[in-house]
């Protein structure tokens, strides 16, 4: 299959949204090398298996020799070194999501309850374990979702709630 960033049209906002879905949904998340920095590539397989883009240097810092296949043209910005230095990079976002998942049992092994909203562009679900409840809201649209309503059934979210933004706290 093609690399995620190529499927998403090289759109970093969409890649961030896809990462949020992947790392908050149930199951074992799988990342193909370079996905966390936005590497691109489409079939045939050789174009997906290009060298890891470590730096903006020649051959993306992968080798001082001549690689059997050239690195992708976006290696000057989509590389580990450049994104390590940028707090708002795709790599930093992946790291934040991975830390969030590792720090919260509900995201690792908790149950999943899909919630309904009156806005089809807002994906809402609850991840819950014996020790915590995490409400996940993901805006699937480029435009802000400022006005929407959630339908919550009695249960894990009943009573007084004190919401906390775990990702940007």
Model-identified regions with their sequence ranges:
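Active-site clefts of carbohydrate-active enzymes
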Residues: 1-10
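Soluble non-cytosolic domains of exported or imported proteins
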Residues: 12-13, 88
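Catalytic and substrate-binding clefts that recognize carbohydrates or anionic sugar/phosphate headgroups
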Residues: 16
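Active-site phosphate/pyrophosphate- and oxyanion-stabilizing loops and adjacent acidic/basic residues
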Residues: 19-20
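Carbohydrate-interacting/catalytic domains
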Residues: 24-31, 37-169
